Amino acid sequence: MDAMEGRTSMKDLTDDISLSAFRRQVEVATTTATCPSAAAIEKGIPIYDGAGASETVAAEWRAILGEGAGVFVVKRAFKDLGAIDAASAVFRDIIADERGPGKAAGDHFAAAGANDRIWNSLQKLCLRTPDVYARYMANPVIDMACRAWLGPGYQLATQVNQVRPGGKAQAPHRDYHLGFMTPEQMAEYPEHIHRMGPVMILQGGVAHCDMPVESGTTKLLPHSQNYLPGYIAATRPEFRDYFEENCVQLPLEKGDAIFFSPALFHAAGENRTADVTRMVNLIQTASAFARHMESLDREAMSLAVYPHLAALSPEGRRAVIAATADGYPFPTNLDRDPPIGGLAPPSQQDLLTRACDEGWDADRLASALAEQSGRRRA
């Protein structure tokens, strides 16, 4: 009988959740056969050199995220460390502005107030300092990783997490979408949704400083994304205990990036240093076909960054446009926004790309974006 036959929800599988079965999934070696282009494998995690990253490695990254280790690191993902420093300065200003009596941005999996958190740091950086944003997001490695897993039209958002000395660790977990539900809610969704959910999201992060393991770099359990009932299992004490006993951590240097499946068991670590304030810009990227966690004003972001796009390289400009504008033309109002000469109307990314190619002035772009937005409303 097919394993799917007769199952209508994950409730049918919860009684079969087994730590021994989980261990068989995760206690496997990561070999060069699964990541031949990697510069090294450390603690079961493939390590790549950003200087040599190209589109040819996309299939390899897909395999790692899908059925491989579930995580990889790109050293020197940012060639321009000045862009990291400039963005870090802006983020520190935002943290200072948002911190105040009675204010705490909170953390989904750690105590409120233990860390500094900037929600929607992508939009805040773009609107506050669009020149820094353009320089920062003109990063082909981030674009390649997102395209490798999600294809074009992806929706990128970021959140800054700054952990001061003494900052506590997160509880181990899986991430959005299903990871942000109670076990009872998770169990309402059928098995194929638990299989499909991780395909719709890519998690990642950019190191904004040198981060030794003692500063609390992310704790990871390679291959744990392969355990189907893992969203529910990750909430259970015996699985959390196993995670704490077997997880691995890697040091990161400023400009390194890490990418992993949202289904990978992971948790931010405790900052046990006396003098390292760990800052990471967390990246959460959704498929064009998925709902994102955060809402962004991508029209305002497109207008803010537009004057700075002409100075970028073609690949840098493509990366910034992909991170900024909406790449999927639906949902829309097909009475007012019908597809003409194709199957879909132009997306916001199409419009921003056309403006760059044809050298529009800012007023023309603003009018075109406003008209497009108006056509899409119900």
What are these regions (language model features)?
Residues A234-P307:
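Catalytic core of Fe(II)/2-oxoglutarate
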Residues G6-I17, G50-A53, H208, P212, ...:
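Active-site environment of non-heme Fe oxygenases that use a 2-His-1-carboxylate facial triad
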Residues M144-A145, Q170-A171, L178-Y242, C247, ...:
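Catalytic core of non-heme Fe(II) oxygenases with the double-stranded beta-helix
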Residues M1-G66, V320-A378:
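Fe(II)/2-oxoglutarate
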Residues D16, R24-P183:
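Non-heme Fe(II)-dependent double-stranded beta-helix
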Residues Q159-V160, G204-V206, N281-T285:
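A structural signal for short, well-ordered beta-strand segments
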Residues D80-G82, R164-G166, P212-E214, Y227-L228, ...:
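Flexible loop/turn segments at secondary-structure boundaries
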Residues D85, T217, Y231, E270-R272, ...:
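Short conserved micro-motifs at the rims of enzyme active sites and ligand-binding pockets
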